[in-house]
Amino acid sequence: MADIPENAPQHCPGTGSTEAGKSSACQGCPNQSICASAATSAPDPAIEEIKEKMSLVKHKILVLSGKGGVGKSTFSAHLAHGLAQDEGKEVALLDVDICGPSIPRMMGLEGEQVHQSGSGWSPVYVEDNLAVMSVGFLLSSPDDAVIWRGPKKNGMIKQFLRDVDWGEVDYLIVDTPPGTSDEHLSVVQYLSAAGIDGAVIVTTPQEVSLQDVRKEINFCRKVKLPIIGVVENMSGFICPKCENESQIFPPTTGGAEKMCTDLNVSLLGKVPLDPNIGKSCDTGKSFFTEIPDSPATLSYRIIIQRIQDYCEKKK
């Protein structure tokens, strides 16, 4: 991401962006004509630095959602836990939801802090093979609000990707904010040179969520971000007593399955509602070890295996 002029509007795409001087945010900016002429455009040196840092990371997976509250961060946390159950795999979880960092609590790491070493920022470890980094570790209190404009968020993401000392990692999972914002553009721009395996998009069955997922899919295609597949979360409730399934959020337009068929995207699986998932997130424990035989756990295992198979085929 290139520099942002001091007198730039709030949603300035950056002087080195392909949208510089052309996006709707540039209207009325005193720098518009200069940026549009490409006179300020220059490669961001951080891109090469990040590429070198990421050369130690085999697979990079972005977790996206069109709408907040569909369980994206919950999925990211459990994807990390599930991959890390293989003790031979090194797993890293990066939280770039700058204004709503929930990963520290979900991973049982609230109150932890980041330490500086000679080789960069040291991530916080949940297990010997599971490392986490989040802006939540930089706040004095979990209740502190992060009130930053786009350029400052982009700078934080750049620092995470360039300066965190992950070491050699098999899987880097990047938990992003909902929607398509500056954070998504920054991550894609910085990681493209290093190679992103793809994105997993999380949704719920109802149309109000699916309509935003369609936009997310279009975003991925426009920025040439491969789509690993879609996960339908909160997909029915299986009674633990009678094992009958009820549709708490009815898929009025066919749910994620029909959407994936229409848009030629893979459906990785459906995760049923389970109150214990929310409980495990609140207590910072792994759902896989707490309720290993629940229908939700079994669904997660199938989805995680499909993600691994996709990544291995891309090697």
Curated annotation (Swiss-Prot):
Q: Which residues are involved in binding [4Fe-4S] cluster 2?
A: C239, C242
Q: Does the keyword Iron apply?
A: yes
User: Where does the chain bind ATP?
Assistant: G66, K67, G68, G69, V70, G71, K72, S73
* Gene Ontology molecular functions: 4 iron, 4 sulfur cluster binding; ATP binding; ATP-dependent FeS chaperone activity; iron-sulfur cluster binding; metal ion binding
- Cellular-component GO terms for this entry: cytosol
Q: What does the cofactor section's free text say about binding?
A: Binds 4 [4Fe-4S] clusters per heterotetramer. Contains two stable clusters in the N-termini of nubp1 and two labile, bridging clusters between subunits of the nubp1-nubp2 heterotetramer.
The family database entries (Pfam families) matched by this protein are listed as: ParA
Question: Which residues does the annotation say bind [4Fe-4S] cluster 1?
Answer: C12, C26, C29, C35
Q: What are the boundaries of the region Disordered?
A: 1-23
Q: Which UniProt keywords apply?
A: 4Fe-4S, ATP-binding, Cytoplasm, Iron, Iron-sulfur, Metal-binding, Nucleotide-binding
The record, for CDD domains, names: Mrp_NBP35
Say which domain of life the source belongs to: Eukaryota
Please give the cofactor(s) recorded in the UniProt entry for this protein: [4Fe-4S] cluster
Q: Which Gene3D superfamilies match?
A: P-loop containing nucleotide triphosphate hydrolases
GO biological process annotations for this chain's record? Answer: iron-sulfur cluster assembly
Where it sits in the cell: the answer is: Cytoplasm
User: Its principal location?
Assistant: cytoplasm
Q: How does it assemble?
A: Heterotetramer of 2 nubp1 and 2 nubp2 chains.
Query: What does the protein in this record do?
Result: Component of the cytosolic iron-sulfur (Fe/S) protein assembly (CIA) machinery. Required for maturation of extramitochondrial Fe-S proteins. The nubp1-nubp2 heterotetramer forms a Fe-S scaffold complex, mediating the de novo assembly of an Fe-S cluster and its transfer to target apoproteins.
Which family is this sequence assigned to? Belongs to the Mrp/NBP35 ATP-binding proteins family. NUBP1/NBP35 subfamily.
Q: Output this protein's name.
A: Cytosolic Fe-S cluster assembly factor nubp1-B
